[in-house]
A protein has these predicted regions:
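Conserved SAM/AdoMet-binding glycine-rich loop
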Residues: 26, 42, 61-62, 342-490, ...
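Glycine-rich beta-alpha loop elements in corrinoid/cobalamin-binding modules
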Residues: 12-13, 39, 58-254, 261-262, ...
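Intrinsically disordered, Lys/Arg-rich low-complexity segments
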Residues: 604-676
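N-terminal pre-triad scaffold of radical SAM enzymes
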Residues: 27-32, 292-319, 352
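N-terminal [4Fe-4S]-dependent radical SAM core
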Residues: 1-21, 31, 229-304
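Flexible, glycine-rich loop/tail regions that form catalytic "lids" or insertion modules at the edges
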Residues: 24-25, 69-70, 198-201, 290-291, ...
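Flexible glycine/acidic-rich beta-alpha junction loops that bind and position SAM and/or redox cofactors
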Residues: 86-95, 144-146, 176-181, 205-209, ...
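Terminal amphipathic helices with adjacent charged low-complexity linkers/tails
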Residues: 63, 193-242, 256, 265-268, ...
Length: 676
């Protein structure tokens, strides 16, 4: 791929284009990958399509403002994003340990972006260009930290990010419409300080009367910092008003100034989404990364397609609804087909579309017909704990799209690897999509997210009850048998979510043990900014009901809950026994079929000594004495309802979990969805 196919990343590349000035500098916390799954690529291509000269500054040296001045002063402004993930999530695990790899950096190298990248980049840009160059802050990190928020890594409530990042405007959500509007006004020489009427943006002011929208005042930063009940009330209001149809602006006082968050922008319609998707992305990393081994994050999404936006799933631990919104919009069939046809000409194309998905793969239209006039229901989830009677569950359009993609010349297989909402799928009276999903679109494993088996915990999570998952699994097995498929389910499970007690974790381990499931990896609850579950973790209050909720906070209890879901691992044995003792479930320590672990006092008897036998000569060869070891064949991971094939173990992950989020490849708080 030639450098001229990308936007310029240096003064030299600008000069090769004959540019001696440029309009917009796009700063990103990830390596520059020109693919529609990467926020820097999307915003830079959107600005380019508006006729602007755009330069990209990816993962700059944040220690020196000179790195920001390397391409000169932009004529219009600086557009800053921290990357596809919150930088703290990208750098640290749920146990607050530093990650050893960064898939969004060249060669998986760590240390290519600072902690709290949005704040650091904004301060360096202001130092580099002074007060006269407008700075526009966006990306997931800024979006989810737009209000005063609990920060897990500091274990404290921080101010809204604009009070620490000296940007003139904050763009939250997906941001294309607001970014285009800001760029047009800057071209017309309008002062950025007068742009107070753009939906999907926020700013700081000393005079709250400048707000152009109907608004509501939230508890101040000082109040939510000092009073957990007020924090929970503020969270409830923030979610209730996050609606582009009926939502109001929100004002939050902070230390003598005021944060103003305007109502959300309307989601892009089909025509607008198609326009963004049809921009000339190269779908590759910039050639400057070749000597470093490229950027690994592209491997999972290079030949994937995002066909929708928004998520009405309502998972309380997921930030996607607070970022993208709950309204679903989707691309046209023609746009998706054009993208896949273009993929078939890529030099690395092997014939496989790795995913046709999004935050939730099988959402393609609004959840009900009332949303366009009334907005989303403020006090009702569409799917949990039971589906709303008004839900419009119809997969026919998605199924038609998949059928068309299968017919494109050069396409061998079209897979669906994003999370499937099985509860929504079961609401559809027509099972044609379910049948064809099993028959044509699973690459060996289907990702679903039951998360837990205890209904009270699932209610805190915003997930359907376990009976729905069991019904799905029964139908899934039947369809696999019908089509003679050996395909598995990868169930995502979560430990230590607010509301989950040690006894609940024991019950989940029992549930898995009885069904022969052995999850290999389990996601411990990660209190990321902006979610309802994080509010529960910090306050011990469910903001939806304002009632107390149990929270596992000590590292030891969190380790025990996680260990219980991996009870077969030898390194977890001691923790599992401790957990069972604390839960009063010593009956699960022993040798019975329902027991989880053996007692620690158990020691295998040493093998009986055998006298060595003299070598035996046979047909010119020497054989040692004793028996030859028999080949071991394991059936523990065999497909449910079938025996393991002779001489072949069942596939690993047949009934367990593989993979985890966030911080992995594009996902849990990134542009595409993870847990569903």
């Amino acid at each position: 791929m030639d450098r001229c196919d990308f936007l310029p990343v240096s003064a030299e590349e600008m000069h090769e284009r004959g540019w001696w000035w440029y309009d917009a500098l796009v700063v990103g916390g990830d390596a520059y990958v020109d693919h529609p799954s990467f926020g820097t690529a999307v915003i830079s291509r959107v600005l380019e399509a508006e006729g602007l000269r755009v330069a990209v500054l990816a993962q700059p040296d944040w220690h020196d403002a000179e790195a920001f001045r390397a391409m000169g002063r932009p004529r219009l402004g600086v557009f800053i994003g921290a990357g596809n993930l919150d930088s703290m999530v990208a750098h640290y695990t749920a146990a607050k340990r530093r990650r050893s790899e960064d898939f969004y950096s060249p060669g998986k190298r760590t240390g290519c972006r600072p902690d709290r990248a949005a704040i650091v980049y904004c301060n360096r840009a202001r130092e580099a260009f002074g007060p006269d160059v407008p700075i526009i802050l966006g990306s997931l990190e800024a979006s989810l930290r737009r209000f005063a928020h609990y920060d897990y890594w500091d274990d404290s409530v921080r101010r809204a990010i604009l009070f620490d990042a000296p940007a003139d405007l904050l763009v939250y959500g997906m941001g294309e419409a607001a970014t285009i509007e800001i760029a047009h006004r800057l071209k017309k020489k309008q002062s950025v300080h007068t742009m107070t009427d753009i939906p999907g943006t926020g700013y700081i002011t000393r005079d709250p009367s400048v707000c152009k929208f109907d608004h509501i005042t939230l508890p101040s930063f000082e109040d939510v910092r000092d009073d957990k009940r007020l924090y929970a009330e503020a969270t409830r209001t923030e979610y209730a008003e996050h609606d582009p149809v009926r939502g109001r602006a929100m004002i939050q006082p902070c230390e003598g100034r005021y944060l103003v968050i305007n109502p959300p922008a309307m989601p892009l319609d089909t025509r607008e989404l198609d326009r963004v998707a049809d921009l000339p992305y190269t779908r590759e990393w910039h050639p400057m990364y070749e000597p470093l081994g490229g950027v690994p994050a592209i491997e999972e999404v290079r030949f994937s397609v995002i066909h929708n936006r928004g998520c009405f799933g309502g998972c309380n631990f997921c930030a996607l609804a607070f970022h993208q919104g709950r309204m679903i919009t989707s691309r046209s069939h023609a746009s998706v087909i054009r993208e896949v046809e273009a993929m078939t000409h890529h030099p690395l194309w092997k014939g496989y579309v790795s995913d046709v998905g999004g935050p939730s793969a099988n959402f393609r239209h609004p959840s009900c017909r009332q949303q366009k006039e009334r907005g989303m229901c403020p006090n009702r989830l569409c799917l949990a704990p039971t589906p709303c009677p008004n839900i419009d569950a119809d997969h026919s359009d998605y199924l038609t799209l998949l059928r068309k993609l299968r017919q494109i010349p050069g396409v061998k297989k079209v897979f669906v690897r994003s999370g499937i909402r099985y509860d929504y799928m079961l609401c559809d009276d027509n099972d044609a999509f379910f049948r064809e999903l099993v028959r044509y679109h699973i690459s060996g494993q289907l990702k679903v997210a039951p998360e837990h088996c205890i209904d009270t915990v699932l209610d805190y999570m915003g997930k359907p009850h376990i009976g729905t998952y069991e019904r799905f699994m029964d139908e899934y097995r039947q369809l696999n048998n019908k089509y003679d498929k050996e395909q598995y389910v990868v169930p995502y499970l979560m430990s230590s979510h607010p509301g989950s007690t040690l006894s609940d974790a024991v019950a989940l381990a029992e549930y898995l043990n009885r069904r022969g499931r052995q999850p290999e990896q389990v996601q411990d609850f990660y209190p990321t900014p902006g979610t309802i579950s994080t509010c529960m973790y910090h306050t011990g209050i469910d903001p939806r009901t304002m009632k107390p909720v149990y929270v596992a906070k000590t590292p030891h209890e969190k380790d025990m809950q996680r260990a219980l879901l991996q009870w077969r691992r030898p390194d977890k044995r001691r923790l599992v026994i401790q957990a069972l003792h604390e839960a009063g479930r010593e009956d699960l320590i022993g040798f019975g079929k329902d027991c989880l672990v053996r007692p620690m006092t158990d020691r295998r008897k040493p093998a009986k000594a055998v006298e060595p036998q003299p070598p035996q000569r046979k047909y010119g060869k020497v054989y040692g004495g004793g028996k030859k070891p028999a080949a071991a064949h394991s059936a523990q991971n065999a497909k449910p309802g079938k025996s393991a094939k002779p001489g072949r173990a069942g596939k690993p992950g047949a009934s367990g979990k593989s993979g985890g989020k966030p911080g992995s490849k594009p996902g849990r708080s990134g542009a595409k969805g993870g847990r569903r």
